[in-house]
């Protein structure tokens, strides 16, 4: 275990409140991105879509993309971005919220922030188990990242609650 995700309430791409409790009992993959990113974010979003497809028959898997640029990434902007990447709204959510809440999640909880810039972030994904425990990180620049995540998701699903 690499950490525990604390309770949070943010705003989803549909403008509705999204609580971490909605992920209880689910295995989920998290990433941090921003919609105007010209670096790794588009590739990461393609990989999240690949995960969505690879896990489409696994009912208790969710994907969560947290913006690091809430000033730009409003729910409407996130909704358009989600459509661009063909996100299944039931399984892949895009979240925004107060900058301090997103910063706390990125830096303190997931440790997926890079030091040195306002909009810098890691290109790693985090795997979270059904109890909200961070179980693994994945380097998305690796060609084996998606198959490894799917394999680990299947292992986590076999664990007792």
Model segments located where?
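N-terminal targeting signals for export/organelle localization
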Residues: 1-11, 156-161
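Short loop/turn microsegments at loop-to-beta-strand junctions
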Residues: 5-6, 28, 122-124
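Structural microenvironment flanking redox-active thiols in thiol-disulfide oxidoreductases
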Residues: 43-105
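Short active-site neighborhood of thiol/selenol oxidoreductases, capturing the structured segment around
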Residues: 18-48
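A short beta-strand-turn-helix
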Residues: 8-28, 52-55
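Thiol-/selenol-based redox modules, centered on thioredoxin-like
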Residues: 116-161
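Structural cue for short, hydrophobic secondary-structure segments
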Residues: 31-33, 65, 127
